[in-house]
Structures are given as structure tokens and as C-alpha cells.
């Protein structure tokens, strides 16, 4: 396992919206044990530096945290809430401006609302530490006396909604007709949440899901380590001498004395056997250790469960009994004392990964416990307020009447509806495990999929929900700012201790009608004998008014994606390994493209590594503007599901098929956009390796995105390897991290789900005993007529006919090469090259290192095909294609028939250089950008200009641009699969036997290497239901969080009494769930008739009836004279006239993702948003941004805009837009003058400030302005970021918005309307 820091490119990726929520752990003395990374935004000190320091140094009231801890120690049955002010010292860069003696920099203070709970040690039940969640104090306009000051501050604007609901209750004649609360769908967990609690729920929900993502990542890392150890164990069977290494360090180089003492007396074969057994035993120990940890599943609370009403809150179980046993077993494991460096490194890395997962689960457990406790206390307070309000209004119905109540049993359908999540019933017989054996996460429930991202915490900081059985009376000593959450401004008539909290926690009341639970669609038939009749108090009124809608616990299985959450509309396209379906999400009506892959096909065709790589790449680019987005990933027993953007513009192969060739002016823009996308990928260490027209998709705006990362390689590029060679003996790949999985301080193992140092490419064994291979190249995985074929032979011996052979027919044990092995490389896979034959680089065919230069070669092939209509090395057979590539025999057409500029020819020749070191782009991307072919291209704002061709689908569901490729035959199969619950129910039965299988397989040990290998494989099979693919689960939290934030803003606007729609961030299109109809994009194009642009793969197929890539001269001439377009108008007309054309050619893609088509934005509420209408003041992004002044803007005063940037030419488009909106624009490029201008007496209407200035950041400049009393202290400020690399950087709270290149006119207009029209 290679330890390394995060890649610098990832440091700026902070998830939107969660930056104002801080997590803090304090020991009982008030010292900091842990602080979330974003806490440094308040303190100015990094989280690592903050660890160990007293919390008293942070707060203006030095005793407030200690007083709160004392109250928690006295009685931890409730949380404690405090208000404090934390001051931030000026950073070093701000001191640059402290040159004028008259100017003093003021410190930034933040008033925080802090809520803490006590955490107890699971072994001793003694207090261990406290957990705090801090957030800025929410200002409220109205404080309702009937609600109470403290609850008003906690709920923010939700308190006004609650007060409005209380007013409604006063008009209700009886308790039988109490109105339910209005609810809002949480996009993160898919629960309907009451509107007054929605904002608070969003914060807690995001905390839980980000912690869950970290736990998932940690599990992925551990699972890859286990696979690497298993491969090492298997390799012992294939060697005469046990010569195995881990991360380049030989294993068993230093033998124990028991083996060395008998070395002389034993024969060589006997000694080798002893060494082999010794290594095998060590590997088996490490594998057993990882299996124990992998068997521990994510903690979560089920939707409903059978419980007693008097069950204490502390007895909530978040782990299954089996997971508790595995947890105790894992914690009891000790590192063996070994002198051998290789084995010691192996055990240390394994132990670090195990602890990383345990710590991640531990922290997730703490957050779940905290969230549920806080939620229950808030609900308890609201419950009491409502009951008192009804009693005061004179209801005669008693609230404490004793009546028979039926306790509903576990709803198994709710707990098994997802193919990923399984809830183990609480009535399962518990194993005989003593409290000493059940360690820190002993109170968690069971989840089917292995937990999964990473947090760093010392494992001694255990979590437990045990607390003292004695409930002390509440005291309120200490600081006057300290207050109990259960102390309301009005007295609570019936403090139900933790009973009502547990009632709501377990969903008691779920048997009520759908009016109380409008979000619940799943019901379970109730058998009379399954109920238990008891005498209990009458249910609280909250159950009658729907308050327990709030009780939907955040981490339940309902929040996990499942195919049953979607309506399958129709198939879009069918490929070799699966089918893409147009689908609508049931809860929101949004449109997605779901890629469905059959597991059996993926395994038999050796595509497991490819689909893993594709998911990993997409996860790392949640909001990339260059890559089609992945929203969800999940699996069932038989299928994998990738929920993607639906890009109804088709792909470039469709465009080529309709036009035959693409005009050079169009090709210039398209190639430039693809080049920017490749630059983005290469900076992240990602090599696409399958660039071709089929994998270049077109959005609704006509701009391009890359797709199909099934053949991608993730790791160091050759240039990165050259830079690192000589510095370290072991080369480590760059670290990646999904913005969803925000890391914590101390993540020193690996912070990424992408690059796993413990994959098989990280270890090697000696190849001396292996048979030397003499082939020039090995060929594998081509698709022809939906058939995967594989051959391994030399280029000279390839037969004239393309041969087929089983995928796994030849398996070679070899030394994996870190420089050329693709991510998730299977240890027994044959050495191979990957890609589509027509676009393969010569170094790929020769079997040499494949680095990022192969993508530039492929881009040259794409440019050639754009201009001439066929690939440059096209031939009748794949063998001849390979020969042409190696000989650099480019099939140039007659340039008189296909006129082309000298610059285009030079660019093609530059890309198609056989020597990678002479190929264009070898030095850097600037070689390409500065080429004369791209003269006139503004690389900084290319995406802001109108595309050459803009698709015009007739409806949001229009798939006329796609070739179904026989997908219609799969529609019935998919429908039956989705509608049948058989597969899901079967999935949930698998893990019922895991615990017993694991325990049975762990007894005893075989000393024979083959037996050990077989047993370790059985370990894996018993431990993971989805062993081949691992925990295939993912949510794009960045997009879902933004949807929640938009909903919150909408509620706020409604409360304020005026309509205010916050413009969405342009880099993700319109946010899912946004009320702004995304279908407005189609409005101005409805008069155009879309062309039917069917897809044809760009791969070679000898059976094509009308091959697009033929270079027959007569065909070229005929096409040029009859079908060739003569002008841009003719091109567009030609596209429109092809709407009803039919192409029957079958495509032959090179990877399973050829059929992936995506859209720039999910489209919601299609039935109500179509036909489309653009409201006044909501101009379509497709309209000209300079056409008119924003009609929604009105101001009687002159508008002044100040632009502070270092390079004026980068933001020329912004200046044009502002001037078109009648602004007086002032521009400052000198950084010192920026501060003086802002501090002067002239007041501006709006400020645009660049963040990444040369000497000091724009954040620091604005800090000084905000802390002063100058005229622009409160002037709205927009942050400017020159590149899309900063796309995931959070907006500093002092800014009012953010713009990045290319400037989005629609977003700018929204900012102007919101900030300058007051």
C-alpha cells in the first residue's frame, strides 16, 4: 500500500452547501479530538493543527464547552445546545495589505449554534467523548411566542411554517380532522419531509450520506487489498520457487529461525515447500483479517421494526448480531511480530486499511446516532406544542385515554425493496456475545452491501449508544448561554423521556393512511395473527396530523437507488453487454438513460474490470463539464445499473452518418472541445483509450461530452512516471477523490475510489520461470455482430479471417507492469491492448507502454474521419488495419474531391506521428492549442459560443437521433425484470447465511497452499454477495444536494411573499427537481424539424451493407457530387430532411458502452411542462445573450459594475454582457489598486472579483472590504474563476455568487436580477 498525499488538483474540490456545517469531537477535558476539514474556514487553523488544542481557545466564552460537557456527564439523556462566537485570525496572505499604518485588519467572528451529545465507550459504558455539530446561527424574522425562542432559532424559517400550521389547527373543529403537514421530497434520501423541518433535515441528511460515502470508499480500498492478497496467494501455485513480492518488496526474504535452522539438513525442494507454506500462512492470516472487516456492514436504522414502547433510546441497534461478532473479531486481531520487511509492509498496510474502514463506520454511527437523537427531540417538542395548542383551544377529547393498540410487525418489503440493502430483522436470535466481545459499533443494523469511503479516527474513539440507565434530572448550570434542547419557552406538559423519540425513530404510526404518509408507496399485507394487542396510551396526536412523516430515518433502505424507483419508457440502444433505456424516476419525473448490464455477460466476456473502471472514472467527475454525468449506480442479483444523463443530441457517429463528412469549420470547434476534455482527463491521470465518434456525445446545446470509460486506464501517465522515476523505488499513482466523499484529516492511505494501490498492479512476482513470449502484439476483445472475441498471436501470423476464441481460453501468469496495466486489472487476464482497431496507436499494437499519447493519436483519427468520412487506416480486415497503422500507411483521399486546408493536414500529421515523443501534444496541451488550425478559437470561452449544429428534438422524450440496434427486442425482458420482485427478494436471502458460513470457514487452517487458496476464495464468496463487482453503489450527492438547496430557496421565497427562482449552476444544466422547466431549452427550436440521426459504430465490419468508411474512389466521387452539402444552409437542411430516413447497418463497437447516450439535464414533470413556454424574464440559454437587456430588471439609478481581474482578455465576454445590460463598467487589473478602489467612497452596484490572483486571493481582498466601514462593505460580490478546473470549489460565504469561464449569460442575468433589483 503506497502512502501519499492527495493530488493537488483535488484539493480544491469541496462539496457545495455542506461547507457551513462543521463536526467537532471533544474529549471530556474539552480538547479537540477531531475537526472536519471545513472547520479551518472558521478558525484559520488546519484540522490537524487543531487536534489536541483546548476548545476554550476557539470560543469567546472559554468555559462554555466545558460547562456543556459537565451537563452531558450529569445527564446525557438529551443533547445540549449552546451559542458561542468563534473568531478567525487573519491569514498570512492578508498581511500583504497591512502596509499602511492607518489600516488595521479586523478579525472575522462567526456566531455558531452548537449541539452536542455524549458518546460512551462500548466496552465499559463509561463516557468517552462528546460529538458536536456546529453551524452559523440562523437569523429569523419572526419569533413566535407559542413556539419558543430556542426552537425558533433551531428551525430557522421552518419556525414560521410551523407557526402557520398551528394557526390552521385553531380552525379545526375536532381532532379527527386535523390537517397534515405539507411535505417536501428530499432528493438525497428520497423521503417526504415536512416543510418546517426540511432545511434542518437536509443538513443532517447530507452529513450522514457523506459519512456513508467515506465508509463506502474505505470498504472499496479494503476489498481491493483483499483481491491483491488473494492474487499473491494464487500465484504461489504457479511457481516452482516461492519468489513473490508485494509492492516491489520480496516476501519471506528474512525467514524465521524455525525454517533457517533446518535449511542445511533439508533438501532444496523441502525448504521451498516450507517457505511456500510460511508465505501461504501469512497471506491467509491477512486475508482472514480483511474478510472479518469486510463482513461488517454499514450501520443504518430500518424503516420500521417491532419494539416495545418503553424501549430506551440507547438500545437502538444499528448493526446486526453477525456484524457485531465480526467487529469484535476484527478488533481482537493483533499484528504478528515479523522481521521480514515485505510481510511487515503487507500487514501494516492491511491493518491501516482495516482501521480506516472501522473508523469510517464508527464516525457514520456517531452521526446517525446524533441525527436521530436531535430529530427525535425536535419532534418531541413540536409534538408537545401541538398537543398544548389543541388543549388550549378547548378540545374535550382526553389525550391520555387508554385504548387497545395494535403494534405493527416489521414491514419486510420496506426492508428488502432495494437490491443493495438488506435489513436483518430485530427479532433474529442474537448470538451469545458478551458485552466485552461487542465493540464500538455494536449497536448498528445490518446492511447487505459491504460498507463503503474513508474517515480517519483513532479506533479507540469507539462509538456506542449505551448510556447510564439512570436518568438524572435536568440541570442548567454554567454559562447563561447554555440551554437544554428539551427546555422550551413554554412548559412541556408531558416529557415522555425517550419514548416518543423511539416511537418516531421506529416509524410507529406507519400503519396510518397515505394521507399521513403520502410518500409511502409500498404496503405489506397484514395478517391478523401477526399483531400483538396491548394496553398502551392512546397514540399521540402527531400520528393523526402526520407529524411522523418527519420520522423517516435518513439512512434507511428507501434512500438507496433501485430499478423499481424508475419507470422504463422505452429502449434507446442495445449493445454487446447490455441495453440503454429511457427512464423516468417515479418520485420526480426526471428523465435519465439507464444502462443495464447483465452480470453473466460481463463476467463471461471478461468485462468486470471495464465496468468497474467506467464507474470509478464517472464517480471522480461528479460535476465535470466534459464528461457525461453519472447520477446513481446500483445492482441486483443479475444486473448492474448505471443511471446517466440522457443526451438526446446523439453522438458524432450519428452526425457523420447523416452528413458523411463534417465541414472543417465545424470540425475545428468539435476537435477543440474534445481536446479540452482530454486535457481535463489527463490532468486527473485518466487515459480514455477509446476515443472515437461513437464515444463523443452531443448535448442539447450542441456542445460535446466524452462518454464510455470502460476501457480507460487510471494511473500515472508516462510523463508523470518520468518525473517520479529516480525519486522513489515504488511509483504511486495520483490520488483521486470523488467530491461526494469528502476526506477527513489524516487520510494517508488512499483517498480515492479510483486508484487503489493495493490492486494487482501494485505487486509482482518473478517471471524467470515463465515462458518467454515472442509475439509482436497480442489482440483481444473486439466486437463484431455483438460477439466478443479474443486472439493472442503475432502480427505476422494473423490469419486472413478474423478468428474467434473464448475469452478465457488463454491465461498467462506474468509480472503486471504499473505503467501499462489498466485499473482493476484481473490477475489472470491475458496481456492485451484495448481500444477500437481503427483508432489504435502503433505503440499499443507493439505492446509498449500506453500513456496519454494514445488519446491524441485517436483524436487525429477522429479529425481525419470528420473531414473525409472514414478512418485513416481503414482496410478490408482488422489485420490489414493493424499493418497500415504500424506502417503509418494513411489512406488519404483525393484532396481535389475533398478539399482541406494545409493547417488541417498538418494537424492530422502531427497527431498521427508513429513516434509518441514526436507526436503533437507530447510536451503539453499548448502544443495543440497553438497550432494554426485552431486560429480564431478562444480556448477560454469556447463553450459559451453557439455550437455549429444544435439538435432539435420534438419532445424531451424524443429518441430520433438514436439507432436502437435491436433494443426493441429487449424491452419486454427488461419490463418483466423490473416489475418482478422475485429477483430482489432472492437477493436479500443471500446474506442470511453469511455469518454462519464465515464462522464455519474460519475454523482451522490448512497447511497446503492449494487448500489455503481455495479456502480464502470461499471466504470471499461467503463474505460478499456481489463478489465479482463489489459494492456497486453510488449517489451523486453534489447534484442531489443542489436540488435540496433550490427547494429550500423556493420555500424561503414563498415565505418572503415574492417569487424568486435561484438560477442553477450552468455546469450541470438545470438541477434535478428544479421548478424551472428545463424543457425551455426546446422552446425556440420547436419550429425546426429534427433529423433522424441514427447511430453507426465507427469500428470495422466486413459485413456492412453500406459502409460509411469505404474509400472506393467511385463512391467518393458519387457522394461528393450528389450528396455532398454545398453550404452551411444545405447542411442544416440535409439534417432536417433525414428525419424519416432509415439506416439498418449494425454497429460493431469495441466496448460495452458504445450504446451510451446521455442528456445534459434530467427533465422533470414532462407532462406539465410540455408544450413549453418561456416566462418573461427567463430567457432561454440558447438565445443570444446580447440580444436585449434583462426584461426583469428595473432600476432608476445608474448601474455601476466593478471588474477586478488579473487578465482582462479572459473576461472580455463578461464586459460585453454587462455593457449590453446598460452597466457602467470599471475595470481594475492591478491588485493593489483593487483594494484601494474598493475601499474608496465610490459605491458600486455589483463587484466581480477574481479568486486566483497572483499576489493574494480575491477572498482575502473581500474579507478586508467586508470588515471595514467603506461604501462597498455590503455591495454584492460575484467570484470569478478563470477555468473549469475549479468547478467543484465551494463559493466562499462572503460572496453572493460565482461565475466561471465560459461566462454563462443566463446565470449572470439571474444574479443581476436578484442582487441589483432591490
UniProtKB/Swiss-Prot annotation:
GO terms for cellular component: cytoplasm; cytosol; nucleus. Its main location: cytoplasm. SMART domains: S_TKc (SM00220). Residues 1116-1127 have a biased composition (Basic and acidic residues). The keyword Chloroplast does not apply. Transmembrane segments: none annotated. It comes from the Eukaryota. Gene3D superfamilies: 3.40.50.2300, Phosphorylase Kinase, domain 1 (3.30.200.20), Transferase(Phosphotransferase) domain 1 (1.10.510.10). The keyword Transferase applies. ATP binds at residues 572-580, 595. It catalyses: L-seryl-[protein] + ATP = O-phospho-L-seryl-[protein] + ADP + H(+); L-threonyl-[protein] + ATP = O-phospho-L-threonyl-[protein] + ADP + H(+). Residues 935-1044 form the AGC-kinase C-terminal domain. Residues 462-479 have a biased composition (Low complexity). GO terms for biological process: intracellular signal transduction; positive regulation of G2/M transition of mitotic cell cycle involved in cellular response to nitrogen starvation; positive regulation of induction of conjugation with cellular fusion; regulation of mitotic cytokinesis, division site positioning. Residues 1200-1316 form the Response regulatory domain. It is an enzyme of class 2 (transferase). Its EC number is 2.7.11.1. Residues 431-485, 968-1022, 1058-1078, 1091-1127 are annotated as: Disordered. It holds the Pfam family Pkinase. Belongs to the protein kinase superfamily. Ser/Thr protein kinase family. This is Serine/threonine-protein kinase ppk18.
